[in-house]
């Protein structure tokens, strides 16, 4: 498999209200993708911030492995093997559910969505995050693929200076989460290691 990928980033890293714009194009034998990602961090006061991520993507493909994902990626979505993941398939040899580690890619919704919400054409998502306390961040997000939509909200718990993040979904397009034994399968996490 051969891929060509190009990107351009413009960022304003000012102390107050920094933002960045990322433009990416990806071409493979069976697909072409293009997207624009906007990240904006609005300072409400000295301690409170509202972070916003907007995503607009386009894909042209007949192979659903290259569809734009509504949810954040897991290891099995990384078809270019460019990300660090604990598990890349669903064999579960590490006793970690393969879909619980997330990579904020494409749509980036923190809860797992049905594959029917992925797109082989266009996808738009927006997510916001507010720092409630030093330990808890409240997030809300929504996305549309041109026909159907998904949305959700929950808590993010940053640990170890944001190297480990735990995502606890509370509400999604399917309603309020059931906090029973099955809830542990809905919890997602991300790991950021600079090796």
What does each model-found stretch correspond to?
Residues 177-181:
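Short proline/glycine-enriched turn/loop segments at secondary-structure junctions
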Residues 138-146, 155, 171-174:
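Active/binding-pocket-proximal capping segment
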Residues 124-129, 142, 154-158:
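Conserved C-terminal beta-signal and adjacent last beta-strands/turns
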Residues 19-23, 52-54, 136-140, 164-168:
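Membrane-embedded beta-strand positions of outer-membrane beta-barrel proteins
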Residues 155-163, 170, 182-195:
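Outer-membrane beta-barrel "beta-signal"
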Residues 1-131:
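C-terminal outer-membrane beta-barrel translocator/porin domains of Gram-negative envelope proteins
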């Amino acid at each position: 498999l051969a891929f060509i990928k190009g990107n351009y980033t413009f960022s304003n890293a000012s102390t107050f209200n920094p933002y960045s714009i990322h433009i990416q194009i990806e071409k493979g034998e069976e697909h072409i993708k293009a997207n624009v990602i906007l990240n904006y961090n609005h300072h409400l006061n000295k301690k409170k911030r509202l972070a916003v991520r907007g995503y607009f993507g386009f894909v042209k493909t007949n192979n659903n492995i290259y569809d734009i994902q509504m949810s954040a990626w897991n290891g099995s979505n990384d078809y270019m093997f460019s990300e660090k993941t604990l598990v890349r398939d669903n064999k579960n040899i590490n006793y970690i559910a393969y879909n619980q580690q997330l990579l904020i890619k494409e749509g980036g919704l923190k809860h797992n969505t049905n594959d029917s919400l992925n797109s082989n054409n266009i996808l738009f998502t927006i997510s916001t995050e507010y720092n409630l306390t030093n330990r808890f961040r409240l997030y809300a997000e929504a996305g549309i693929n041109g026909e159907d939509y998904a949305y959700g909200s929950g808590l993010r718990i940053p640990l170890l200076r944001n190297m480990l993040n735990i995502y606890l979904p509370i509400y999604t397009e399917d309603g309020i989460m059931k906090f029973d034994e099955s809830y542990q399968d809905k919890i997602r996490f991300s790991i950021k290691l600079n090796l």
